[in-house]
Amino acid sequence: MSHSVKIYDTCIGCTQCVRACPTDVLEMIPWDGCKAKQIASAPRTEDCVGCKRCESACPTDFLSVRVYLGPETTRSMALSY
């Protein structure tokens, strides 16, 4: 699958998205931009299955982590209706 995972600077460093990801796409890295001194990172986006559990787990209401599904997934979702 070809999905894009974006982490935004609204991340509060809580690790909820990292713990929610079933395929270990996300990890925490050092960052001085928030109190937690860490931010989520997505070094393994090729393993993303598009489940969006990271988005659901994020306490900032999807403002910090977003999964953009690839065209093949979006197309198959439309066909299932």
Curated annotation (Swiss-Prot):
Localization, UniProt: Plastid, Chloroplast thylakoid membrane
Highest taxon listed in the record's lineage: Eukaryota
Purpose: Apoprotein for the two 4Fe-4S centers FA and FB of photosystem I (PSI); essential for photochemical activity. FB is the terminal electron acceptor of PSI, donating electrons to ferredoxin. The C-terminus interacts with PsaA/B/D and helps assemble the protein into the PSI complex. Required for binding of PsaD and PsaE to PSI. PSI is a plastocyanin-ferredoxin oxidoreductase, converting photonic excitation into a charge separation, which transfers an electron from the donor P700 chlorophyll pair to the spectroscopically characterized acceptors A0, A1, FX, FA and FB in turn.
Catalyzed reaction equations: reduced [plastocyanin] + hnu + oxidized [2Fe-2S]-[ferredoxin] = oxidized [plastocyanin] + reduced [2Fe-2S]-[ferredoxin]
Entry's Gene Ontology cellular component terms: chloroplast thylakoid membrane; photosystem I
InterPro entries per the UniProt record, alphabetical: 4Fe4S_Fe-S-bd, 4Fe4S_Fe_S_CS, PSI_iron-sulfur_center, PSI_PsaC
Listed EC numbers: 1.97.1.12
Binding residue positions for [4Fe-4S] cluster 1: C11, C14, C17, C58
Subunit structure, as described in the record: The eukaryotic PSI reaction center is composed of at least 11 subunits.
Comment on bound cofactor: Binds 2 [4Fe-4S] clusters. Cluster 2 is most probably the spectroscopically characterized electron acceptor FA and cluster 1 is most probably FB.
Keyword Chloroplast: yes
Primary localization: plastid
Membrane topology: Peripheral membrane protein
Entry-linked Pfam families: Fer4_7
All copies of domain 4Fe-4S ferredoxin-type, residue ranges: 2-31, 39-68
Gene Ontology biological process terms from the UniProt entry: photosynthetic electron transport in photosystem I
Name this polypeptide is given: Photosystem I iron-sulfur center
